[in-house]
């Protein structure tokens, strides 16, 4: 039986840190679903459709990644996708407490759903989509932190 994992997030936009995590996850699992949350309460810069398209382009080189948008409760989405592993990236100790709460709640809602925490490579450990957008808004160079297609889309949004 295939081991299916979900890597959820808002990915507004997807960064090289996210690509690092999903790439490493593809080496651990047969099928990785990059699940892009609608997250209307976060007021994303990119629409869900744009985020899905950008992520599909940025992960096209990874054969066992499927990019999908979702707005469901994570445990229900995982169950519907027949996934038993939830991948979460941890950048710093500060991320851990919140992620632990989410993991416990997801486990309560779906006991067979296991959370796996991956640390990004050192090079990406300090970046977030929010930080990249903030730097870009102030004309800072963010080319190193984003896939090329995402960088172009971000610059177009900010123009």
Swiss-Prot record:
Listed cofactors: Mg(2+)
Q: Which Gene3D superfamilies match?
A: HUPs
Protein residues bound to ATP:
10-11, 18, 89-91, 99, 124-130
Keywords on record: ATP-binding, Coenzyme A biosynthesis, Cytoplasm, Magnesium, Nucleotide-binding, Nucleotidyltransferase, Transferase
Instruction: List this protein's GO terms for biological process.
Output: coenzyme A biosynthetic process
Q: Which GO terms describe its molecular function?
A: ATP binding; pantetheine-phosphate adenylyltransferase activity
What the entry lists under NCBIfam families is as follows:
coaD_prev_kdtB (TIGR01510), cyt_tran_rel (TIGR00125)
Similarity field:
Belongs to the bacterial CoaD family.
UniProt-recorded name of the protein: Phosphopantetheine adenylyltransferase
Q: Which organism is it from?
A: Escherichia coli O45:K1 (strain S88 / ExPEC)
> Lineage of this protein's species?
Bacteria, Pseudomonadati, Pseudomonadota, Gammaproteobacteria, Enterobacterales
